[in-house]
């Protein structure tokens, strides 16, 4: 009798499947998926660098994780994307430590950035790069690729794409006709075009087909009652930025709405870099150098390149300029929120490591500025995850938390939907399925 009772139990043991090994499990965690979905409590497992499963409650029976993380009270978000950077070696570890697992580099030495972008590495962010930017004669940047004709534009795009560029960046001294030629050639090769505008308005560039407009450039020019004056000012790089920035505080809100509607109709994505706009407005602030985020910046960089008085002197900026820049910032913020409300897309970017735009920390500040301007926290997170991945053409494998996607994840100590500043309260950063940073 005892034997007959034991036989079924022994059979179950003999034929039960072995425990399913996974590399990592995060249990009992709230998941903000990046596209607006929220799962209040779940367990996520990772295997071979990808999200294996998302299950309600505890780890599924039969799953044996190599590393088991209790996520109770925490929130898991997708790895963050900064869609406007200029990579340096010292910036990469800072970016990853702040949860930035992907970056789009929009100008750098091609011999440095393009080979780096080809190398997949779990100890730094994924890089999609433009190589050298394309600009007209007299460019502010000595390493820009100079184009003067339509033939130049087409050849430059062919060369950039052949060299591995994932995006083409056009700059301030290019007129609309040459921007259009760049877009046409890039489109034939399935490559997007980003634009920092100077000699073309944002509306013109959107109609020409650029994928994204950086820094909200060309918008003040399009909304101004004297656009020719602003367009001409961009012949001097800093002078053009200064005049456009000051113009924002004077613009008619109704005219800005018209421009926003035209941009939305053109389907262009805005990459506002509000953290950069704010950083420039704070150069005369006495507490600027006391920002705790500066602790991550090498002393040699702070001493040589980040002296606020020296920056203002070289740019010809005065305390009055700073006041005008501060007055412009809330107008920029409201424009961003309004653009999203009318159905336009905004993607988070910072221009780090521009002075006082600290790698990683500045992206969290970018999101805070969006929310302070009227965007919801969920929309701000989407701008740095799902929408950013879509702009970069990588939404099939990153940008949201879904089974099968790459395990680029950030575990937060609080809920960023309730308080956007929680994106900076990082407990773990997971890059390609491996824990890259742990507080």
Model-derived regions, located:
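Histidine-rich, glycine-flanked metal-binding segment
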Residues: 20-22, 31, 35-77
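Active-site mouth loops of central-metabolism enzymes
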Residues: 78-87, 137-152
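Bacterial Sec-dependent signal peptides at the C-terminal "C-region" and cleavage site
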Residues: 5-23
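Acidic, glycine-enriched loop/beta-strand segments at the rims
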Residues: 31-43, 56-57, 358, 376-381, ...
